Amino acid sequence: MSKKRLSNQVKTWRFLAQEMTQSELGEKVGVTRQTIAAIEAGKYSPSLECAFRIAEVLGRPLEDVFQWEA
């Protein structure tokens, strides 16, 4: 079984969402700025609920924001 990892475009979509800050996104999602920073850096994989909330706040489908890569 090959090792896959979760990648994301949170930073890109956050910037395109009127240059939303990490703090603003975190507040709307219900997590800290540090959590958003860790997700963007690929150091933390969000829960499924958190991933859906991020996509919803950014106004994008989940698959536009998060990708499962080999």
Where are these regions (language model features)?
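Residues within the helices of the helix-turn-helix
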Residues: 11-12, 23, 52
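Short alpha-helical DNA-recognition segment
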Residues: 19-38
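DNA major-groove recognition helix of helix-turn-helix/homeodomain DNA-binding modules
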Residues: 49-64
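A short, Lys/Arg-rich alpha-helix, primarily the initiator
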Residues: 1-18
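Residue-level signal for the short linker/turn that defines the boundary of a DNA-recognition helix
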Residues: 8, 19-20, 46-49
